[in-house]
Each structure stands twice: as structure tokens, then as C-alpha cells.
């Protein structure tokens, strides 16, 4: 199977989950009861990040940048998830939480380019 293709799809899922996280996070701060949706999207994103790491390793790619970026995405999502769980009652944490989310979004977009380039090399 083409594991890098599945890693790319999982990265797309992380990007969509990040956008969903942003919308539910903003809605939560506006008084809507979307805490469950925010938590489920965070869990889905975490599983997708772990899947990306597993798929990249299983693809046997020698690209160190691809491996490093996939581990980096999973690590920062895990940190973000931990911050969300630990400080859910503190409103000031959203200042840090939002900045990390923007970094995750940018990192996932960059990872998409690296996966696409590596996939193009392997599919030739």
C-alpha cells in the first residue's frame, strides 16, 4: 500500500481538525456549550498525528526532514492536548493555546508539502 498517501490524508485530517478546534474554541469562549466537540476533535487530531508518525516510519522513507516533521507535529499536538486538559478552567490559557494552534496549522501545511514531494519521488 502507498503509506505516504495515507499519511497525506491524515495530515489533511489534522488541518481540518485544527480549523474545527479553532471554531469550537472561539464558540466556547463566546458562551456556547461545545466543550465535548472541542475535546473529541482534539482526540481525533491526536490519533491522526500518531497515525502520521506510524505511516511515515512504515513507508521506510529515508527523508529525515519528513520523519522529524511528523514527530514534531505529533509532539506539539500532544503538548497542546495536555495544556487543554490541564488548564481547561483557566481562560488565560487560551492565549497560549491559540498561538500553539496556529503553529500546528502552519506545521501541518508544511508537512503536506514535504509528504507530497517525497510521494512524488517514490511514485516515479
Task: Describe each model-derived feature in a short phrase.
Residues 1-124:
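Polytopic transmembrane helical bundles with strong interfacial aromatic enrichment
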